Amino acid sequence: MSTLHDLNGATIAFDLDGTLVDTAPDLVGALNIILAQESLPPLPFDDVRLMVGRGARALLERGFAAAGAPLDAEQAPALVQRFIDVYLARIADESAPFPGVVEVLSDLKTAGAKLVVCTNKLTNLSTALLDAVALSPFFEAVIGADLAPAAKPDGRHVAAAVAAVGGDVSRAVMIGDSVNDALGARNAGVPGVLVSFGYTEEPVETLGADLVIHSFLDVPKACITLLTSCPAPNTGL
């Protein structure tokens, strides 16, 4: 009978926004502050929520377009930095871990799994967020897009995260919420699990994950299933 002990020594990589933490409220708030500073109308929460997860520049590009003023390429770097500053100042005003996250991470760590964050968010923002919501102690490393050879969906990002904690892709799982996570896992030769409660515009069942789960409490069972019964997929590296 499979148990949590089967995950001893395994590496589990987690996306951050929309997977571990519901960050949309603070990201939407920061975007709307920038839009207001540029004399543009605020955007509805539900619209912006689906724009989250591809990095600050992508969020600003989509947000400005939705507000009726495409982002000017020359002004973009300064606006991105201003957005980051605004967001960092309120990074966990309303953000919180999804239900079950703390319990599951504690169980996985106790079982001996190596836990790492693999996110397209900048590393400094990621660590600040994890500190603010008290999740940092669970993770051995945080690999943001700026620390990877290329960001997800490039498999080298997932592979770099696994390597950062001394893991092996042959005994690793990627947990995320988007097509970038599913493809990043597949391209690294790692089985991928997607949660259904995150930030994606497409039906999560269509994104090519090995498993889809509807509660974070199902993460351990999904990892055990994939690591004990399924060979690792062929790497695209």
UniProtKB/Swiss-Prot annotation:
Keywords: Carbohydrate metabolism, Hydrolase, Magnesium, Metal-binding. Pathway: Organic acid metabolism; glycolate biosynthesis; glycolate from 2-phosphoglycolate: step 1/1. The keyword Cytoplasm does not apply. The active site is at D15. InterPro entries: HAD-like_hydrolase_sf, HAD-like_sf, HAD-SF_hydro_IA, HAD_sf, PGP-like_dom2, PGPase_prok. Its cofactor is Mg(2+). It is an enzyme of class 3 (hydrolase). PANTHER family: PHOSPHOGLYCOLATE PHOSPHATASE (PTHR43434:SF1). Specifically catalyzes the dephosphorylation of 2-phosphoglycolate. Is involved in the dissimilation of the intracellular 2-phosphoglycolate formed during the DNA repair of 3'-phosphoglycolate ends, a major class of DNA lesions induced by oxidative stress. This is Phosphoglycolate phosphatase. It comes from Caulobacter vibrioides (strain ATCC 19089 / CIP 103742 / CB 15). The lineage of its organism: Bacteria, Pseudomonadati, Pseudomonadota, Alphaproteobacteria, Caulobacterales.
